[in-house]
Amino acid sequence: ASSDWSSDVCSSDLGENLFELTDDELAILCENTTIFAQLSPKQKAKIIKVLQENGHTVGFLGDGMNDLHAIFQSDVGISAEGATEALQEAADVILLKKDLNVLEEGILEGRKVFVNMSKYIRITASSNFGNILAVVIASVLLPFFPMTSIQLLLLNLLYDVLCLILPWDNVDEELYCKPRDWSGKTLGRFMLFFGPISTIFDLTTFAFLFLWLCPTISGGTFTSLNHESQQTFITLFQTGWFLESMWSQVLILYSLRSKKIPFIQSKPAKPVILVTIIGIILFTIMTIIPIGRFVGLTKMPLSYFAFLLLVVLLYISLVSIAKSWYVKKYKELI
């Protein structure tokens, strides 16, 4: 909204001039007129309906009984605290003070929350798709499940808890300066594009764990071990993938939250940084303390964390490259 609203006025018109217009003429007039004055209740509702038919989402602010029809017709009915009781009952939003800046701030905050919700849905969907694809491939190649069902549920629960902070994340100005439609049309494209990248690094982790780390600690390849040693092998493997999945899902938020370069061109909110770092530390500690044993997790050697750090850095780098290509082709990310 402009601080000097008069400079945004294109033209104005009176209600008495609308009677002779056809529907097509009125549709054109509504698109090119900023102020209508001296309108009847039916004309107010008619203009709102025309704007809706033109593809707009329309809010209407009223305070008297003659605004009731327009309030019902609008997508968002707005009233003030001192308005008639019937109008307040019909309105979706009631202003507690006479200040239109409240509406502007509310709209902008709503758009920011909407963008952050879109971030969560897209990033979570792509991560889950990548994990599912990795599980399917691993189920064919491995003699055991790469992660138990309770571990998968715990991983998703912990990730969702961390993502509760996302509504307070910073949003790039170009993402909320204009209205955005709630649509899942590009969700599948985003998921299919970024999900398999996660799968590549999941499979890389599988290979590292199955062919080197687990045999080294357990004392041999899986098929050559006795039952007890095989259980140790499986626990190490599942813990390794649990950590890799958790680290990669959380840290990739920073890369996919904006089409800009993270921390340089687009800085996440401090609470988001704090919560994600604390979350990673706590969930990593969970694999060390006794409580982790109840869900089949165990302590991993330091050599694994060196590998984990390398994998996560490579994953973020590849996603950043893919993101640049994606934005260049589709002109958007979120």
Q: Residue locations for each model-derived region?
A:
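Short, exposed "boundary/linker" segments that immediately precede the start
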Residues: 1-4
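Membrane-embedded transport module
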Residues: 7, 12-60, 74, 79-261
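Cytosolic ligand/metal-binding cores
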Residues: 71
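C-terminal transmembrane module of polytopic membrane proteins
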Residues: 214-216, 239-334
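Glycine-centered helix-boundary capping/hinge motifs
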Residues: 6-7, 296
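Conserved Rossmann-like nucleotide-cofactor binding loop
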Residues: 66
